[in-house]
């Protein structure tokens, strides 16, 4: 029996579109407007933006388009983008440590002025309960485990003053005046306790200067 041929256009995957030029569902204009708003924000205050929608509504595609738009903007206005997918770390003992470890690894790697920021994030992570060993658990960031391990060794004999570390980290961000965009997707795929843990750490870090959070999730599932 001859099998029916299926046109390629009818096939799709769970992977989001990443190029606005290939936009089939009209997400690009909204993503462009959102990227422009993020790039144009001149204040030093931290911002948290949320993109709500059910599964399959195009949230991940919008996030990808926003990152694409920001990459091709004026260099002086480009934020340092850190993408974090908590679903990769789902089931780990401490999701918050994975998130801080990602920031620690990515920020200095993408912007030289953030080397001290990365060190302070390691100390801040340690002050919140010890640095987790994340070696080999961060996709696409092979240095993450080594960075966190070295941070743990430095913190072994140091007193941990969370308010002082937070103040020092805020001071460095104010000095650099470089906007950071933290993109977090697939929050609604986490277990309820993991969602609470992630939102708790975001709340604790939301007031850092020059840091913008862009979150995507199904509000009916994650909240």
Q: Where do the model's predicted regions map?
A:
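Non-catalytic regulatory/linker segments of enzymes
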Residues: 4-12, 76-78, 102, 143-144, ...
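Short, flexible/disordered secondary-structure transition segments
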Residues: 45, 110-114, 213
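Short coil/turn segments at secondary-structure boundaries
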Residues: 47-49, 115-116, 183
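A short acidic (Asp/Glu
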Residues: 62-64, 94-95, 192-196, 223
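P-loop NTPase nucleotide-binding core
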Residues: 63-175
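Conserved Walker B catalytic segment
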Residues: 161-220
């Amino acid at each position: 029996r001859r099998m029916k041929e299926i046109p390629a256009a009818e096939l799709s995957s769970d992977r989001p579109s990443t190029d606005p030029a290939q936009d089939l569902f009209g997400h690009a204009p909204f993503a462009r407007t959102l990227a422009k708003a993020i790039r144009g924000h001149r204040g030093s205050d931290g911002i948290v933006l949320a993109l709500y929608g059910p599964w399959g509504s195009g949230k991940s595609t919008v996030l990808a388009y926003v990152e694409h738009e920001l990459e091709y903007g004026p260099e002086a206005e480009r934020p340092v983008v850190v993408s974090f997918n908590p679903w990769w770390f789902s089931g780990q003992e401490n999701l918050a440590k994975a998130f801080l470890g990602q920031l620690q690894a990515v920020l200095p790697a993408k912007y030289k002025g953030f080397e001290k920021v990365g060190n302070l994030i390691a100390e801040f992570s340690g002050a919140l309960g010890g640095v987790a060993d994340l070696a080999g658990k961060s996709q696409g960031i092979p240095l993450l485990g080594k960075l966190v391990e070295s941070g743990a060794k430095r913190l072994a004999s140091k007193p941990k003053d969370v308010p002082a570390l937070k103040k020092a980290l805020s001071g460095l961000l104010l000095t650099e005046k470089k906007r950071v965009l933290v993109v977090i997707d697939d929050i609604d795929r986490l277990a309820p306790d993991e969602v609470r843990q992630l939102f708790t750490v975001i709340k604790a870090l939301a007031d850092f200067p020059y840091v913008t959070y862009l979150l995507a999730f199904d509000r009916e599932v994650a909240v």
